Regions:
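Acidic, gly/ser/pro-rich intrinsically disordered tails
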Residues: 1, 19-22, 107-156
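OB-fold and OB-like beta-barrel modules that bind single-stranded nucleic acids
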Residues: 5-12, 31, 71-82, 100
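Core FKBP-type peptidyl-prolyl cis-trans isomerase
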Residues: 5-47, 90-94
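Conserved positions in beta-strands of structured domains
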Residues: 11-12, 16-18, 58, 82, ...
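Short, acidic/hydrophobic/Gly-rich beta-strand patch recurrent on exposed beta strands
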Residues: 28-32, 54-56, 98-99
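A beta-strand/beta-hairpin structural motif
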Residues: 42-67
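Beta-rich strand-turn-strand
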Residues: 58-92
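OB-fold/S1-family single-stranded nucleic acid-binding modules
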Residues: 88-111
């Protein structure tokens, strides 16, 4: 599945930034998104169930996100949805990932100052580049699944 979605949520882990041997910048983090509703009888906001996503950005987006996004930030993400089943022999579960096309701060929760970056002209994506991206996403997904218990995404 590769649907384009937009999600608002809270950055739940410190973003990881790396550059592959081929020079591909990658930034990845976990995003927690909860629906909220106002309960008039209690006169307070109630959090609904939390959905967890692994968000990964590449190239210039990865560079910009690594310097702009921090754990605890409220953000908006638009990208391609990927849902993958996994089994490591001891546990099994489902990983929900977003390959980000854009990331920005949610201005409902605060203000931001925008700084334009100089863009480097990108060449057309090659099959080798696509394979490197897929491999990097798989490796990052495995790392995040191992750490998922630390941010409340425990699989049973």
């Amino acid at each position: 599945m590769s649907e384009l979605i937009s999600v608002a949520g809270l950055v739940a882990t410190t973003p990881r930034h790396l550059v592959t041997q081929d020079g591909l910048p990658i930034t990845s983090f976990r995003l927690a998104s909860s629906q909220r509703r106002f309960d008039r009888s209690q006169n307070k906001w109630i959090d609904g169930e939390t959905n967890w996503y692994t968000v990964t950005g590449f190239r210039q987006l990865a560079i910009n996100a690594s310097t702009s996004v921090s754990k605890g930030d409220r953000i908006l993400v638009t990208g391609k949805l990927r849902v993958r089943d996994w089994d490591n022999g001891e546990r099994a579960g489902t990983s929900v990932e977003i390959e980000a096309e854009s990331i920005g701060h949610d201005l409902s929760w605060g203000s931001a100052v925008f700084t334009r970056t100089v863009l480097v002209r990108e060449t057309e994506t090659s099959d080798t580049d696509s394979a490197a991206i897929d491999e990097a996403v798989d490796n990052l997904s495995k790392e995040f699944l191992q750490e998922a218990e630390l941010v409340g995404n425990k699989k049973k």
